[in-house]
Amino acid sequence: MESYAIHASSRIKWQAKLALIIKEGLAKHGVNAVITDNRDKVSDTSLILGPNVWKKVEAKGNYIMFNRKFLGFNAEDVHENVAISWDGFNGRGTFCVSDLDENRLARYVKDEEILDYKENMGGINLLCEQHDLGRSTDWKNINEFYDYIYERYRNVAVRKKISPENVGVETWKQQILKELEDVKTAHILNSTVSAELTIFGIHVASHDIGDPCYALKGKEDKRMELLTYLAHCQWHYSEINNGEWWDKLKKKVGPQLHEI
């Protein structure tokens, strides 16, 4: 019989909370998953909460990753939704998406929030910093990637990191849109910020297949299709608790996100 283990740290609040929700949802499908803080793989299928703590488990393969959501600006979107994928995350994950519901995108993004693409031909090349390389192997470290951007492009500015929770969503939007007024292109390695900037009409240069919006390279006219797809890649805690997500992801099928 297939064994399942949810790798979560009891010392990390969101992991401890979500692990119980996952366990309850799987039980409704007759799947008995144990919760463990073991840093090694202990089951046939591993369920990993986040990409930072469980890299040894990840390296053994056959795992499902629960990671940061792609869409939504409100506190509930941030704290009660996660993207779920097989054997990778962001652009490298397999999200098993089928039967698109065009209305799902509206749960996270209003029509009026999706802005027309901006054309600032002489504008700023916006460098979007991130914690590390993700799973990119093209650079030795994240600073080497930054150096690459500075050497290759002119008029580079670093994106300011502003949290909507600190200033409120509407004030945050105003500040972000003000910063983006003179941006020609945003340069992103593989951060979920690419989805946010795509919504705000910024041309995104994806420098790694791990970027959630890598599939838009040369196909910006497919923006709405990609955003709708991303809405199907993330799940609300209620959908995880009732086991709805498992109906879609119990079988590892479909392309990686960067291949769609």
Where on the chain are the PLM-derived regions?
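Catalytic donor nucleotide-activated moiety binding site of glycosyltransferases and closely related
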Residues: 8-11, 128-129, 133, 142-177
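Short loop/turn segments at strand-loop or loop-helix junctions that form parts
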Residues: 5-9, 66-71, 122-134, 159-162, ...
